[in-house]
């Protein structure tokens, strides 16, 4: 057990350190190659590197691989969880990078996470029997792998990409989600426990990335980062049988989806900045960020902290309902 705990600790440290090193390197590379975007929520509209998500991918892969190496012979069945999530994350990371570089159309981009579901299907992660409130347990059989699993991963990845645009918002939301899933998983056994460990690694990586991404951001995650985080969160939830938790954790994104759908997904999440640095939105809200802007006078980091607070409340509900009340 001691060796296993040391392996977990080493994996978390490796993930965190590699994220710091690789993100700093990517920032320099993006500045040299011109991979930057305007920070439109600032008065100065500075150019900010947009491929910071590469650091997230590198840190997560390094941390997960370290955990796999240090725990493979000690934990039967760990390969299915870690390897499937690792392969899935590499696929979505690569596709996200292509999107950032070549600007893939929105319609095509929406279906990219389906490819990331292939390793999860091949390793048969998840459980075909799902407990549904008021209906009881339902065995979806093969439909789980050909419909439910790919659909879940597609939804979690695309939804996560919708609510972004403010410094640190997405990475912080991902950190909260990862900590909630880690708590649930580590309280459980078997596959859920392994998924919880992977979630701890993701949390350490996102914490490291936030050092560069929180206000004022030195880099943006890009589509590679947002799709990656959403996809990994979905993979962890699926492999750890934490479907109820995923439902509650993604409720803010359900709100975001409804608001964006009203604009036919052409809406934005950023606001209009005044000369004092406060963000405003006077039109009909097409993002959760706009709702916050309309209820008070806030600067960018205030809005981020408020939405983080909302996500923390849903994370608490996720933990309670997943571990105490029901299991979907």
Swiss-Prot record:
Catalytic activity entry: a di-trans,poly-cis-dolichyl phosphate + UDP-N-acetyl-alpha-D-glucosamine = an N-acetyl-alpha-D-glucosaminyl-diphospho-di-trans,poly-cis-dolichol + UMP
TM spans (from-to): 1-21, 48-68, 78-98, 107-127, 129-149, 166-186, 192-212, 228-248, 301-321
Alphabetical GO biological process terms: cell wall macromolecule biosynthetic process; cell wall organization
Membrane topology: Multi-pass membrane protein
Entry GO CC: plasma membrane
A GO molecular-function descriptor: UDP-N-acetylglucosamine-dolichyl-phosphate N-acetylglucosaminephosphotransferase activity
Source species, domain of life: Archaea
Activity regulation summary: Inhibited by tunicamycin.
Main localization category: membrane
Entry's EC annotation: 2.7.8.15
Localization per record: Cell membrane
InterPro entries for this protein: Glycosyl_transferase_4 (IPR000715)
Keyword entries, A-Z: Cell membrane, Glycosyltransferase, Membrane, Transferase, Transmembrane, Transmembrane helix
Name of the top EC class for this enzyme: transferase
Family note: Belongs to the glycosyltransferase 4 family.
Protein name from the UniProt record: Putative UDP-N-acetylglucosamine--dolichyl-phosphate N-acetylglucosaminephosphotransferase
Organism: Sulfolobus acidocaldarius (strain ATCC 33909 / DSM 639 / JCM 8929 / NBRC 15157 / NCIMB 11770)
Gene: gnpTA
């Amino acid at each position: 057990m001691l060796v296993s705990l040391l392996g977990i600790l080493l994996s978390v440290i490796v993930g965190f350190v590699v994220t710091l090193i690789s993100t700093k390197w990517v920032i320099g590379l993006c500045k040299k190659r011109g991979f930057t975007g305007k920070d439109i929520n600032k008065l100065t509209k500075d150019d900010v590197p947009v491929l910071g998500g590469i650091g997230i991918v590198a840190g997560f892969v390094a941390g997960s691989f370290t955990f796999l190496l240090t725990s493979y012979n000690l934990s039967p069945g760990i390969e299915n969880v870690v390897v499937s999530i690792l392969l899935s994350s590499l696929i979505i990371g690569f596709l996200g990078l292509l999107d950032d570089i070549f600007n893939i159309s929105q319609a095509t981009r929406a279906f990219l996470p389906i490819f990331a579901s292939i390793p999860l299907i091949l390793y048969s992660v998840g459980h075909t029997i799902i407990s549904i409130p008021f209906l009881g347990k339902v065995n979806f059989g093969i439909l789980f792998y050909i419909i439910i699993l790919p659909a879940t991963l597609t939804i979690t990845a695309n939804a996560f990409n919708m609510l972004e645009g403010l410094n640190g918002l997405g990475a912080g939301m991902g950190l909260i989600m990862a900590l909630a899933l880690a708590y649930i998983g580590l309280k459980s056994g078997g596959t859920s426990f392994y998924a919880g460990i992977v979630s701890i690694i993701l949390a350490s990586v996102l914490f490291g990335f936030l050092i560069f991404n929180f206000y004022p951001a030195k880099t943006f995650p890009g589509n590679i980062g947002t799709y990656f985080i959403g996809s990994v969160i979905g993979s962890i939830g699926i492999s750890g049988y934490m479907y109820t938790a995923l439902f509650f954790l993604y409720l803010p994104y359900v709100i975001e989806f409804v608001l964006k759908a009203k604009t036919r997904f052409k809406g934005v999440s950023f606001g209009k900045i005044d000369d004092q640095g406060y963000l405003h939105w006077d039109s009909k809200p097409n993002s959760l960020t706009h709702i916050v802007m309309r209820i008070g006078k806030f600067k960018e980091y205030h809005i981020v902290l408020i939405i983080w607070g909302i996500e923390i409340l849903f994370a608490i509900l996720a933990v309670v309902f997943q571990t105490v009340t029901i299991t979907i």
